[in-house]
C-alpha cells in the first residue's frame, strides 16, 4: 500500500475535529517541508516512537557500465537513511505475527 500526502490529509480531516481539507493539506506539506529543510541544513531528525532520518556520506567507489563493462567512478555523495525505532519495529513484527 502506498500512502500519499493527499491520503494523509484525508486522515487528518477524518480524525481531527475542526480541520478543513485545505488546512490538512497545508499541515502535511509543512510537516514534510520541515523534514526536507532540516535534512538540507545537515541535521538529523529523530521522531520518538517512529525512527531517525540520518545523513550519511558515501565515498567515491568504482562501478561498472553494465552495457560496455567499462569501469566508471561512482562519485561521492550524501544520502538520507531511515532507521526505524524499536517501538515501530515491534509494532510491525506484532502485526506480521498476527497475519501468519
Swiss-Prot record:
Q: Where is this region: Disordered?
A: 53-72
InterPro entries of this UniProt entry? Hist_DNA-bd, Histone-like_DNA-bd_CS, IHF-like_DNA-bd_dom_sf, IHF_alpha
Q: Which GO terms describe its biological process?
A: DNA recombination; positive regulation of metabolic process; regulation of DNA-templated transcription; regulation of translation
Transcription regulation among keywords: yes
Record GO terms (molecular function):
DNA binding; structural constituent of chromatin
Q: Name one GO cellular component term.
A: cytosol
Would I find Amino-acid biosynthesis among this entry's keywords? Answer: no
Q: Which UniProt keywords apply?
A: DNA recombination, DNA-binding, Transcription, Transcription regulation, Translation regulation
Q: Name one Pfam family in it.
A: Bac_DNA_binding
Q: Summarize the subunit comment.
A: Heterodimer of an alpha and a beta chain.
Family stated for the protein in its record: Belongs to the bacterial histone-like protein family.
What is the role of the protein in this entry?
Answer: This protein is one of the two subunits of integration host factor, a specific DNA-binding protein that functions in genetic recombination as well as in transcriptional and translational control.
Q: Which NCBIfam families match?
A: himA, PRK00285.1
Q: What is this protein called?
A: Integration host factor subunit alpha
Write the lineage as a comma-separated list. Bacteria, Pseudomonadati, Pseudomonadota, Betaproteobacteria, Neisseriales
Gene name for this UniProt entry = ihfA
Amino acid at each position: 500500500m502506498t500512502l500519499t500526502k493527499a491520503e494523509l490529509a484525508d486522515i487528518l480531516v477524518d480524525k481531527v475535529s475542526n480541520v478543513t481539507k485545505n488546512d490538512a493539506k497545508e499541515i502535511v506539506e509543512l510537516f514534510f517541508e520541515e523534514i526536507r529543510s532540516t535534512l538540507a541544513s545537515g541535521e538529523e531528525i529523530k521522531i520518538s516512537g517512529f525512527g531517525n532520518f540520518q545523513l550519511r556520506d558515501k565515498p567515491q567507489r568504482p562501478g561498472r557500465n553494465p552495457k560496455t563493462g567499462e569501469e566508471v567512478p561512482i562519485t561521492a555523495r550524501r544520502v538520507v537513511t531511515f532507521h526505524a525505532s524499536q517501538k515501530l519495529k515491534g509494532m510491525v513484527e506484532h502485526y506480521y505475527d498476527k497475519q501468519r
